[in-house]
Amino acid sequence: MEKIFLIAIVGPTAVGKTALSIELAKKFNCEIISIDSVQIYKRFDIGSAKVTPEEMNGVVHHLIDELEPNATCSVYDFQKLARDKIDDIHSRGKMPLLIGGTGFYMNAVLNNYEFTNLEEKTYDIDVEKAKQYLKENYIDTYNNIDLDNHRRVINAYNYVMNEQKSVTTNNNGDTILEKYNPYLIVLNTEREVLYNRINKRVELMFEQGLEDEVKGIINDYGTELQALGAIGYKEMLPYLKGDVSKEETISAISQNSRRYAKRQLTWFRNKMNGVWYDTRSESLLNDVIGDIKNKFK
């Protein structure tokens, strides 16, 4: 079987994944696949820190603005979309470069995860009971989902209740698909530095027009969209209703983002066999390029 060589970059929110991905894409003739459950939707730009055309700098990106805001996309759907993109990029003689902050989604794409369609059967259960069940029986899944996103919690519960081979039940879930030969990069930095970056990013989102972005989406599609349950968007709903202040909203998004970053790092340490790099290093780019060359020589 011909191996597909690829690069994958993971890291917590605001650590600096985008900048590195662009440099590596230019160096190794890559096209980038975004492994992000929100950036795949049109119009969800500012709150998801979606890469801008200027930041892309001519590098082709996939699974950005792929779906309409009112579409639904489970991890089962995302896995197929991403794997199809990998095959397409490879068939054209380029190297796929995957980038994302959610280890569960990255592992679902690269590893031997098998999912059945969630629509086959759904269970009516209280969110808190679903959380408790996942915590007691599927702790890895519990630790990697946004517990404040009720849709994600229920989806995770349905996956395991449908007796799928999921993150904690698939015997081969920790092994890379035989067809892939990835170089997995895990970016991190000192906690205080990371948290400061997160706080500044949230403030910048408001300056860039997050409020108007969310207003426009709600006016056109309502409040029941899947992506509105994500950090950076769900906190905006009570703010737009007038229930909380702007300052309280900024604080809530920042706090939720920091907590999520902590869970992301826990997942990367426990469930991903990658090479770790500190983004504060002045030699980061050269170090990564050298290591990739050694991997694929």
Regions found by a protein language model. Give the residues of each.
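Phosphate/pyrophosphate-binding catalytic cores of soluble transferases and nucleic-acid-acting enzymes
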Residues: 1-297
